[in-house]
Amino acid sequence: MAKVMMYSTGVCPYCVMAERLLKSKGVADIEKVRVDLDPPRRREMEERTGRRTVPQIYVGGTHVGGFDDLAALDRAGGLDPLLAAP
């Protein structure tokens, strides 16, 4: 299963929904980067993604986007193959 990394904050309902969706797909370990506690990592997120909102989710080396992007990818049938990649 591909490695999953999520930029998040302590109070973020979309982060919780993203984590719930990923866990329903069998993802046991999500690397969470708390950008509210680590300003340099927030800058890193903004530079890498061009976005300022959380969550920002990476599956393997692929930037999926936020929760709406993740859910849309799942509905389109693209999330399972992405997660299955080594």
Q: Which residues make up each language-model segment?
A:
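Local sequence-structure signature of Cys/Sec-based thiol-disulfide redox active-site neighborhoods
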Residues: M1-D29
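Short alpha-helical
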Residues: P13, P40, G65
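Alpha-helix termination/capping residues and helix-transition junctions
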Residues: S24-V27, R51, V64
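Chalcogenol-based redox active-site neighborhoods
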Residues: K25, E47, D80
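Thiol-based oxidoreductase modules, predominantly thioredoxin-like and allied folds used
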Residues: D29-R42
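Thiol/disulfide oxidoreductase modules built on the thioredoxin-like
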Residues: E47-T53
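Non-catalytic, surface beta->alpha helical segment in thiol-disulfide oxidoreductase systems
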Residues: V59-A85
